[in-house]
């Protein structure tokens, strides 16, 4: 990326500083998903043949498995580490496996090239890193909303089940830190269900705002593409 602008190698400290891969490797699932969609788009435009599309999609599937492969290796060598330790080990292993990767986009390009050769470079046709990161971030937020929403729904269902089991049990309500009139325990629990429903509606609205694709917008002027806005 830098070689086209500078005649001398970058200072080592600056080179490490400008790399975002140690952080944005977490966007691997989203980068792969966006790359698959783009592969279908350029195949529809005649840039990839059907065989090339199949090879590209299969290669991307293998790249997407990298973190799982590292997780299996870590478990095999050190037993079953706790969640935080395991994530740190996976992160260190992934970053160390691609010291030359500038960012998640470059990482996928390098790993896909290992899998399918020069064909991987065709995937760069008609897209820029600007739109790639914009797409990845929207997918990441959307996936996070889905995960959070599922958790909230499960929590609400648990509260409803618990409320149904309390029967006519009562408890004191509180106002200004002082006990007030008695209320049903079920009603107190269901009040939290109402709060969860409010949060779910907000997440639903946020997801709708996230759910469009900025692909084909390029660095500044848009370029025509069947995927734009979908």
Positions of PLM-derived features:
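A helix-coil-helix interface module used to build multimeric assemblies
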Residues: 1-75, 82-222, 226-229
């Amino acid at each position: 990326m830098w070689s086209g602008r500078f005649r001398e190698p970058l200072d080592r400290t600056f080179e490490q500083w400008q790399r975002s891969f140690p952080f944005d490797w977490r966007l691997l699932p989203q980068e792969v998903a966006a790359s698959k969609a783009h592969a279908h788009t350029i195949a529809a435009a005649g840039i990839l043949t059907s065989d090339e599309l199949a090879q590209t999609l299969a290669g991307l599937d293998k790249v997407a498995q990298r973190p799982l492969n590292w997780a299996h290796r870590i478990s095999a060598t050190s037993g079953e580490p706790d969640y935080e330790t395991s994530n740190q080990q996976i992160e260190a292993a992934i970053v160390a496996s691609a010291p030359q990767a500038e960012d998640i986009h470059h990482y996928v390009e390098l790993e896909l090239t290992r899998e399918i050769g020069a064909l991987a470079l065709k995937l760069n046709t008609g897209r820029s890193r600007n739109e790639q990161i914009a797409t990845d971030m929207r997918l990441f937020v959307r996936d996070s909303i889905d995960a959070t929403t599922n958790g909230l729904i499960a929590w609400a269902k648990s509260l409803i089940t618990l409320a149904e089991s309390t029967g006519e049990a009562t408890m004191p309500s509180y106002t200004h830190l002082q006990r007030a009139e008695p209320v049903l325990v079920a009603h107190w629990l269901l009040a939290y269900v109402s709060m969860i429903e409010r949060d779910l509606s907000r997440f639903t609205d946020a997801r709708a705002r996230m759910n469009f694709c900025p692909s084909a917008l390029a660095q500044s002027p848009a370029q025509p593409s069947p995927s734009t806005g979908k």
